[in-house]
Regions:
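Generic beta-structure capping elements
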Residues: 10, 39, 73-75
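An N-terminal amphipathic alpha-helical segment
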Residues: 1-28
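Intrinsic-disorder/low-complexity, polar/charged segments enriched in Ser/Thr/Lys/Arg/Asp/Glu/Gln
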Residues: 4-6, 31-35, 67-69
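C-terminal structural segments of small proteins and small subunits
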Residues: 48-77
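Amphipathic, hydrophobic secondary-structure cores in small proteins
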Residues: 18-58
Length: 77
């Protein structure tokens, strides 16, 4: 999937991946896509809740043995 910016939150536990995501989205334009890589198993639930609460769209979640990759589309302001 194409993306505009990447944030690597590997090795960080809650709430740091979400905080890195919020910071990454802060200087992006509406409809741009942020790729976030995380290793915390709780991040799946956290990112789903974050997107519901903020109005950003979780476009895709990829998972392998060691990490989760989230593609988040920034909402229109």
């Amino acid at each position: 999937m194409e993306f505009d910016k990447e944030v690597d939150a590997s090795g960080l536990n809650c709430p740091l991946p979400i905080l890195r995501c919020k910071k990454g989205l802060s200087d992006m334009s509406a409809a741009q896509v942020l790729k976030v890589i995380a290793t915390d198993p709780g991040s799946v639930k956290d990112f789903n809740a974050f997107c519901v609460q903020t109005g950003h769209e979780l476009l895709q979640l990829d998972q392998d043995e060691t990490s989760f990759t989230f593609y988040i589309k920034k909402r229109a302001d």
